[in-house]
């Protein structure tokens, strides 16, 4: 007779969870950061707020962002004037947009990941969908299942309202699913659209303006599984270890609240210092078992909440200037896409590593770290092992 322990052993994969493919997508509408303040204050009928516009211009200039992609065009905003006011009741209009557009953008990223993976979509066993852009029932996970034509018995997980740390969360969950379900192939999708947070400027809510200067739209998808099929599935990164922690004394550092006016964003100025003060503890926990204490010897993927966070982390740890190269590139080209950001960076790193003729997907290095930072203040840590390019 078979024992419970024997059944459990048979259910588990042998090797570590591995990323097999990555796909990304953005809306077609591209916004240049240099001209965005003019557009933003014009479309929100706020051109008379000259001092506020000058502040916003400085925020945009210091953001290290060149361009972003947004579903919201001038035409859409003119058709929905309530989105352009500050705190006008507008949740219905926002919901009507994102309930359709979030799964649609997610499908675009997922389709690219599935194509790179090279296996039939019928082999997908689990789906994790993550968004901070709107809520609905049945959720975006259900809508994506229909859009992609996945099997109706794919096991789905819907993560709403997690915010900017969630790119790490989805990898942590995917790792647990892949390693504890032999043969599992997990499709992970993060899709974010700023239609929930866009609103006109206010002198009394400057942290909302920070969000208007940083956030962009994007979706990213990865395929995760254990025990890659030889000559069929190409391993990109192994997910070796994960952790989640709430930073001490950080309550209220980053908040978001769903209101009649959409999703409001609140940010304390000391977020960069809170992150930089606590990041070394997370690194020690991850890398001490490997006897690694030189953090310039690993590759880096950090959620680019803004340039100040990256600057302070680099300064605190004495990181070389190019350590955050992939992270800064994604911030520059796309802005802060919340949960999707770190997956975009993962994609950029493996692409550039191959393009530059480096030996591994992690800039030629063996070990690396992925960090998600977000509401809480919550930090997600993922220890990565790179693979041959």
Curated annotation (Swiss-Prot):
Belongs to the thiolase-like superfamily. Chalcone/stilbene synthases family. Pathway: Secondary metabolite biosynthesis; flavonoid biosynthesis. Transmembrane segments: none annotated. Its EC number is 2.3.1.74. The primary product of this enzyme is 4,2',4',6'-tetrahydroxychalcone (also termed naringenin-chalcone or chalcone) which can under specific conditions spontaneously isomerize into naringenin. The active site is at 164. Disulfide bonds: none annotated. The lineage of its organism: Eukaryota, Viridiplantae, Streptophyta, Embryophyta, Tracheophyta. This is Chalcone synthase 1A. It comes from Pisum sativum. GO terms for molecular function: naringenin-chalcone synthase activity. The keyword Transferase applies. Pfam families: Chal_sti_synt_C, Chal_sti_synt_N. The keyword Transmembrane helix does not apply. It is an enzyme of class 2 (transferase). It catalyses: (E)-4-coumaroyl-CoA + 3 malonyl-CoA + 3 H(+) = 2',4,4',6'-tetrahydroxychalcone + 3 CO2 + 4 CoA. The gene is CHS-1A. Keywords: Acyltransferase, Flavonoid biosynthesis, Transferase. Coiled coil: none annotated.
């Amino acid at each position: 007779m078979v024992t419970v322990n024997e059944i459990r052993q048979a259910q588990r994969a042998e090797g570590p969870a591995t990323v097999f493919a990555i796909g990304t997508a953005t809306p077609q509408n591209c916004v240049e950061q240099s001209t965005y303040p003019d557009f933003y204050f014009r479309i929100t009928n706020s051109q008379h707020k000259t001092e506020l516009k000058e502040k916003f211009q400085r925020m945009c200039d210091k953001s290290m962002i060149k361009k972003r992609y947004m579903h919201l065009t001038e035409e859409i905003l003119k058709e929905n004037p309530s989105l352009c006011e500050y705190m006008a009741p507008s949740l219905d209009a926002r919901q009507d947009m994102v309930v359709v557009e979030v799964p649609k953008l997610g499908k675009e990223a997922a389709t690219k990941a599935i194509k790179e993976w090279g296996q039939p979509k019928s082999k997908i066993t689990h789906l994790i969908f993550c968004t901070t852009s709107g809520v609905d029932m049945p959720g975006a996970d259900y809508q994506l299942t229909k859009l992609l034509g996945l099997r109706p018995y794919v096991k789905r997980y819907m993560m709403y309202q997690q915010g900017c740390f969630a790119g790490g969360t989805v990898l942590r969950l995917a790792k647990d699913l892949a390693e504890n379900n032999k043969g599992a192939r997990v499709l992970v999708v993060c899709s974010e659209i700023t239609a929930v947070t866009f609103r006109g400027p206010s002198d009394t809510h400057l942290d909302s303006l920070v969000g208007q200067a940083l956030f962009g739209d994007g979706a990213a998808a990865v395929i995760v599984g254990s025990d890659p099929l030889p000559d069929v599935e190409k391993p990109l990164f192994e997910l070796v270890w994960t952790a989640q922690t709430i930073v001490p004394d950080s309550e209220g550092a980053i908040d978001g609240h769903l209101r009649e006016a959409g999703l409001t964003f609140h940010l304390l100025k000391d977020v960069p210092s809170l992150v930089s003060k606590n990041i070394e503890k997370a690194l020690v926990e991850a890398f001490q078992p490997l006897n690694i204490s030189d953090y310039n010897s690993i590759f880096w993927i950090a959620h680019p909440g803004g340039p100040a966070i990256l600057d302070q982390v680099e300064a605190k740890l004495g990181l070389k200037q190019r350590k955050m190269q992939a992270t800064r590139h994604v911030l520059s080209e796309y802005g802060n896409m919340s949960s999707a950001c770190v997956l975009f960076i993962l994609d950029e790193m493996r692409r550039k590593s191959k393009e530059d003729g480096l030996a591994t997907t992690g800039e030629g290095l063996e070990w690396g770290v992925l960090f998600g930072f977000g509401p809480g203040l919550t930090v997600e840590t993922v220890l990565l092992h790179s693979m041959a390019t």
